[in-house]
Amino acid sequence: MPIFYESLSDNLRDWALRQPLFFVSSAPYRGRHINVSPKGLPDSSFAVLSPSKVAYVDSTGSGCETICHLRENGRATVMFCSFDATPRIMRLFCTGSVIEWNDPRYAGYVKRMGVKSLVGARAVIILDIFKVQISCGFGVPLLDLTVDPETNEPKPCFTNRPRLGKFAEYTINRGELPEYQMQWNSRSLDGLPGLHSAMRDKGEFIWWAHVTNWASYYHFQLDIIKTGMALMFLVMVVAQWVGYVLYQW
């Protein structure tokens, strides 16, 4: 079951900096492409500036999705996960901004982060945390060693953790799976409708879920229509006022 915090504690900060990589996801408001970028070198490019603010040095790459999305809507999520014996997933839900390499503030942020500016770095990404989510990570594979049959040399490999399957089996045997799904799978973090079977078990109407999804999907167009109607009303009021003034003359 997930646990939520408003900021990073010292032990979560230290754990994050020990991980070999992290992931950054972002998306435009209306575009089709949702971006996920793996980032290496967290110990030398990622920094925790305060319990509610983190930053990382962004290297030049073949795309610029995160920077573009942050400048459009300021939304990003950072995820760390453990590949060792102790499983964990940590997500940092953030709002962010971009400090480019030629910005006068860039050198100051790099110094504050306590990292060396990477060769080819193009920006520092500043992220303000508004929610921290911790979950079990039992579905993340374990990094292990095996023997290459051709060379007889050890090589890294991924092995599945048995805990997730055992948890599901235990929950099913106790008849607790529907209750678990009702609690954790019926809604998203933002309240969007989720698993229909879980919603039915909670006594919710699926047709209303479809209406909610439709309204969420088309809210941008609805906002444009409402704004257009408000502007039209304002123009009509101004036109009537101008006509009244001219009539008085």
Swiss-Prot record:
Consequence of gene loss (knockout): Decreases the production of ustiloxin B.
Protein name, UniProt field: Pyridoxamine 5'-phosphate oxidase family protein ustO
Bilayer disposition of the protein: Single-pass membrane protein
Keyword annotations: Flavoprotein, FMN, Membrane, Oxidoreductase, Transmembrane, Transmembrane helix
Similarity comment text for this entry: Belongs to the pyridoxamine 5'-phosphate oxidase family.
Cofactor: FMN
Gene3D superfamilies assigned to the protein according to its UniProt record, in alphabetical order: Electron Transport, Fmn-binding Protein, Chain A
Recorded GO MF terms: oxidoreductase activity
Known EC number: 1.-.-.-
GO cellular-component term (any): membrane
Pathway the protein acts in: Mycotoxin biosynthesis
Domain of life: Eukaryota
Co-factor: note: Binds 1 FMN per subunit.
Binding site for substrate: 21-24, 215-217
Stretches assigned to coiled coil: none
Binding-site positions, FMN: 76-81, 91-92, 105, 163-164
Top EC group: oxidoreductase
InterPro entries: Split_barrel_FMN-bd (IPR012349)
Major localization class: membrane
